[in-house]
A protein has these predicted regions:
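Short, glycine-rich nucleotide/cofactor-binding loops
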Residues: 22-32, 146-149
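Glycine-rich nucleotide/cofactor/substrate-binding loop typically near the N-terminus or early
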Residues: 42-43, 48-105
């Protein structure tokens, strides 16, 4: 597909889609990073559904909330004793704003089982575009970097979706720099983006205007989630929301980051988007995960790959 500077490639790529699934790739609050995109797409007339690879105790929800095997349809009224429930928190916020309020949730799974769950949901909703959203950029790691961040859920999501027959499959990242806490070298992130560009798989960067409707509502949703989950607010989305609001530097908003120096900055408010299949093709260990059923299997196979790899790329300091 040929893109133009006049139209953001992210929106150009999704223009033919009728029904779009935006799914948090890394679990937990990652789905919130897709909210500005979802709001913009809905304003343009697209039908958008939200999904999340959940860290909540989905086994505790009522049976009526299960749409199918390994696919829960979380609504504002979904009952659960689990206090950490980002999907329900988001569903309630959406309902309060008179928006479609179902957030689909997948339990932690291996590649084969998550792929089956995605296939079920895609068929159920007649989806023709899937966008995996990552809060941070460690989803762009290919395996030979100095550190991979927290790859388990991200790579499981990529491996699950890349094999599905869906016309449009994208990955977008919001929160550049956040994964430094987990050892990610962001020069290597930029190196990977450049390689994806050479392969024709980079759809550019798109900043969220701080005064836009999408930005205002996103900040409101993040604040609502922080209030609903005071013991475990999203560090990732808290920093992104601060960046989207024009904040800079060591912006503290939770005791969870006390003792750490944050670096909130405008790069965190930019979507970096790539073609999902191109990204999957560059992963050095994706084939090892193909037959996994459980999350534990994914973890052990990533660990085995990292133990076997002869050398990793030497991290570099950003020179500017």
């Amino acid at each position: 597909m040929t893109f133009s500077l006049a139209v953001p490639p992210l929106f150009a790529a999704l223009a033919p889609a009728r029904r779009i699934l935006i799914a948090g790739a890394g679990g937990g609050f990652d789905v919130y990073a897709g909210l500005p995109l979802a709001l913009a797409l809905r304003a343009n007339g697209a039908e958008v559904h939200l999904a999340s690879l959940s860290f909540s105790q989905l086994e505790l929800i009522d049976q009526e909330s299960w749409a199918d095997r390994d696919v829960a349809a979380i609504t504002p009224d979904t009952a659960s004793p689990d206090w950490y429930f980002p999907e329900r928190t988001l569903a309630r916020w959406l309902a309060a704003h008179d928006m479609p309020s179902t957030v689909y949730a997948f339990p932690p799974l291996g590649v084969r089982t998550l792929r089956a769950a995605y296939q079920t949901l895609i068929e159920r909703l007649d989806i023709d575009a899937v966008v995996l959203v990552d809060g941070g950029t460690d989803i762009l790691m290919r395996g030979d970097e100095n550190a991979l961040g927290t790859p388990v859920e991200d790579i499981t999501s990529i491996a699950a979706v890349t094999a599905l027959d869906v016309p449009i499959k994208l990955v977008t990242c919001l929160g550049f720099g956040i994964d430094a806490y987990h050892g990610v070298n962001h020069v290597q992130v930029l190196e990977n983006i450049a390689a994806l560009d050479r392969d024709g798989g980079y759809l550019g960067a798109l900043s969220i205007p701080g005064s836009s409707r999408e930005a205002v509502l996103y900040r409101e949703a993040v604040a609502d989630a922080q209030a609903a989950t005071p013991e475990r607010p999203s560090i990732v989305n808290g920093q992104i929301a601060a960046a989207v609001g024009g904040a800079f530097g060591d912006v503290q908003f939770t005791r969870r980051t006390s003792g750490s120096t944050l670096f909130v900055n405008p790069l965190m408010a930019i979507y970096f988007t790539v073609d999902l299949d191109t990204l999957a093709a560059r992963c050095l260990y994706l084939d090892r995960l193909e037959n996994t059923i459980s999350r534990r299997q994914v973890i052990s196979r990533i660990e085995a790959f990292r133990n076997e790899i002869a050398t990793t790329r030497v991290p570099r300091v950003y020179p500017h």
